[in-house]
Structure formats: C-alpha cells, structure tokens
Amino acid sequence: MSLYATQDEKKQAAAKAALKHLPKGGILGVGTGSTVNFLIDLLPELQLEAAVASSQATADRLKKLGIEVVDMNHVGSLDAYVDGADEIDRHMHMIKGGGAALTREKIVASIAKKFVCIVDDSKWVDQLGRDFPLPVEVIPMARSAVARKLVSLGGDPVYREGVVTDNGNIILDVFNLNILNAIDLEKTINNIPGVVTNGIFALNPATIAIVATNDGIEERTAQ
C-alpha cells in the first residue's frame, strides 16, 4: 500500500521535503522539469532574494510567482541548486536532459555549493542508461559526425525530432550505452567536436537525493 495515489503526488512530496535543504533568502539555482515545477510553486515560502533559472520555461514560471530571475553572469556562486533527474544511482550520478535543458542545468549547477536532487523512486536505478537514453546536445552542423562517433562508442543515437534547445541546438538521444564508468563517459562524449554537453552528471554529482517512495520520503547520499 503506497502513501501516494499517483506519481505526481510522489513528486509533490519530494518537492516539499526538499525545502528544508534550501536556503531562506539568498539566490537559488533552479532546474527544469515536472518535479521542479512542483517545487517552484512552493518557493515563495523561502522568501528568496532571486533565482537563477536553467531554462526559459523555469524563468517564466518563477516570474509568474513574483520571484526575480537574475542572469548567472551577475552571480558569483549559489548556496544551492535544486533539480530533478531522469535517472540517478547510488553514487549520486545522474542522467538529465529529458526536457532538453541539460546544458544550462549543468552550467547553473556548476556554481552551486550543493546540488539537491528531487525524484520519485521510479528514477532510482542500479545502472545509468539501461532504461533511459542519454541526451546529447549537439551543434546542428555536427549532427551526423557526432552520431557516428556515438555509434563507435556502442550507442544508438536517435535525433529528437522537432526539438531545439534554448541555445539553438539539437538533441541526440543515445540508446543502449553501457554506462559502467559515468565520469569517464561524460568526459569522452564531451570531447567529441560538435558536442555542447551530454546528460551525464557525474563530474558534478548530486549532494543529496530526496526520493519519494511508496513508504514516504528518503534522503540519500553517495555510497
């Protein structure tokens, strides 16, 4: 018997539980996605000075709630960055980018003192990449060249039709990658000419994961 009737209720619970890990006042980095949207609706409780958004969609939602959104170039560091994940493992390594905001998410997370990841337990996995493809943001002219390189790494890249990132680039979703060493693969793919970044977040993993399970909220850190 689950405490939650739907997956959305789990997402809401994870979002609410994350609030105590976020600073009151100050400037918060905010990610993108359905779970984060539940959190954004709760952010007025924190009386933030401002927020740095990882996507235009997040910026628009924050502004509607009266939260000032500032350019990251005017911010030295963030006390925290909060975001969801498409997959996360016990090392706090993640796959992100289902919403095509991976590059800006990775940039904003890079200046935060801690990364709070909020997920429901369907996103918790033993190994990254088995069930969810790895998104890779690519400069359009390099699409075919990058795809060939990804095939040589054992992946099956598929062009995400009709999607243009906030940076004007395209997404290749890479299926069937055997992600045994997430840090090495993140570096390898990022070194392919034409790749902006990929959706492995292992070089800068989550600090803590707030996981909504059938039995309630669990707080998990790297093992």
UniProtKB/Swiss-Prot annotation:
Pathway terms, separated by semicolons: Carbohydrate degradation; pentose phosphate pathway; D-ribose 5-phosphate from D-ribulose 5-phosphate (non-oxidative stage): step 1/1
Keywords tagged on the record: Isomerase
A GO biological process held by the record: D-ribose metabolic process
An example Gene Ontology CC term for this record: cytosol
InterPro entries: NagB/RpiA_transferase-like, Ribose5P_isomerase_typA_subgr, Ribose5P_isomerase_type_A
A Gene Ontology molecular function term of the record: ribose-5-phosphate isomerase activity
Entry protein name: Ribose-5-phosphate isomerase A
